[in-house]
Every structure is written in structure tokens, then in C-alpha cells.
Swiss-Prot record:
Entry similarity comment: Belongs to the small heat shock protein (HSP20) family.
Inducers of expression: By heat shock.
InterPro entries reported for this sequence: A-crystallin/Hsp20_dom, HSP20-like_chaperone, Small_HSP
Listed SUPFAM superfamilies: HSP20-like chaperones
The protein, known as: 21.9 kDa heat shock protein
Organism (species): Oryza sativa subsp. japonica (Rice)
UniProt keyword annotation of Nucleotide-binding present: no
Length: 206
């Protein structure tokens, strides 16, 4: 009897656990900027970043942001004259950031590396007498890609790094206008045309 009662209790616990899992909201709903947002972006922002922030992916998820954008969050705005992309890269030196443009595909690529605390001292041989009590700042490599829309002059891209913010400006082609939608003529007889043909046939028979 005791074994039967124990099995019943375990079955009830399993059922309750399953209900809790089913009632839990989707994880993506807790993330303000995730893969669903990227797929809905009309400018097709392409995201990839093999970065490893302090604490790993779990720490980034707990902080409410995907690991893919933890090191280099960005904004993209369009003005009448240009597209302006700003990327937060605090602690990243100018020599550790690279901006590339593929003119054929109109893809702008920003990549870089934020070095871990103490890396510079180790390279310069300044380890003697230095003790690190804490190193929490995220470190790792990152890269972000953006496909520029037609009309962006990817041959005149300019970039500037100030106070940990990288600003990339892509001017627009002067006088560029997007293609107007082409109206397609529809072939085939409409209801009115068919009625006219019937009337003509009737008169001919008379």
C-alpha cells in the first residue's frame, strides 16, 4: 500500500510540474532584443557575435539581454542625408575595432575585441607587483553586420570613435529615389465585357 501511495504522490508532483512548464511564458518574451526582432527588421540586420561575456551566456540572459549583443549594443537611425549607426564599445581601443564594407552586397561589418582586465599589463610586462582582486567587465570578440538599403553610398563610409561610442556614417546618394511600384495590366474578360458579347450575339441572331 505504501508503494502505491508513493507512486500516486510522485504522479501528482509530475503532473503539477508539467502544468507549471506549460504555463510559463516564452523565454523570448523576457528578452527586449532577440532573434525575433532581427527577423522583423526591415533593413535585415544580421547579427553574429562569438563573444563570451563574464559569466557566460547564462549571465547575459539573466541580465535581460542576449549574449550576441552584450558587448556591442547599437542604434541605427536614418536622416535625410545619411544612415548613422552608433555602437557602444566601452573599454575598446581604436586599434581593436575594425569597420569593413562589402560594396557588392552593401553589408557594413563592425568587429572588434574588448580585452580582459590585465591583458595590456601582461603584454607590456607589468605583471610584477600587480594583484587583481576583481575583474567583472565583459571581455571577448564581437561583430555586428548591417545590410544597407538601396540609396546608401557605401563607397563613402566614415567612422569615428569617441568616449567608447563608435559612430559609422553612411551618406545617401544625392537625388536617389526608390523605385516606384509598377502597375501591372490585368488581361481577361470582365463581367461587363461578357454581357456586351452576349448582347451583340443576340442582335446578330435576330
Amino acid at each position: 500500500m505504501a508503494a502505491v501511495a508513493e507512486r500516486e504522490v510522485l504522479g501528482m508532483v509530475a503532473a503539477v510540474a508539467a502544468m507549471v512548464v506549460m504555463m510559463a511564458p516564452p523565454a523570448a518574451a523576457l528578452v527586449p532584443y532577440g532573434y525575433g526582432y532581427m527577423l522583423d527588421d526591415p533593413f535585415r540586420v544580421l547579427e553574429q557575435s562569438p563573444l563570451r561575456p563574464a559569466g557566460g551566456v547564462a549571465a547575459a540572459a539573466a541580465a535581460g539581454e542576449p549574449a550576441a549583443v552584450a558587448l556591442a549594443r547599437c542604434d541605427w537611425k536614418e536622416t535625410p542625408e545619411a544612415h548613422v549607426v552608433t555602437v557602444d564599445v566601452p573599454g575598446v581601443r581604436r586599434g581593436d575595432v575594425r569597420v569593413e564594407v562589402d560594396e557588392a552586397s552593401r553589408v557594413l561589418r563592425v568587429s572588434g575585441e574588448r580585452r580582459r582586465a590585465g591583458a595590456a599589463e601582461e603584454e607590456e610586462g607589468e605583471r610584477d607587483g600587480v594583484r587583481w582582486h576583481r575583474a567583472e567587465r565583459a571581455a571577448g570578440r564581437f561583430w555586428r553586420r548591417f545590410r544597407m538599403p538601396p540609396g546608401a553610398d557605401v563607397g563613402r563610409v566614415a567612422a569615428r570613435l569617441d568616449d567608447g561610442v563608435l559612430t559609422v556614417t553612411v551618406p545617401k546618394v544625392p537625388g536617389h529615389r526608390g523605385r516606384e511600384p509598377r502597375v501591372v495590366a490585368i488581361d481577361g474578360a470582365g463581367a461587363g465585357d461578357m454581357e456586351a458579347e452576349v448582347v451583340k450575339a443576340s442582335k446578330a441572331e435576330m
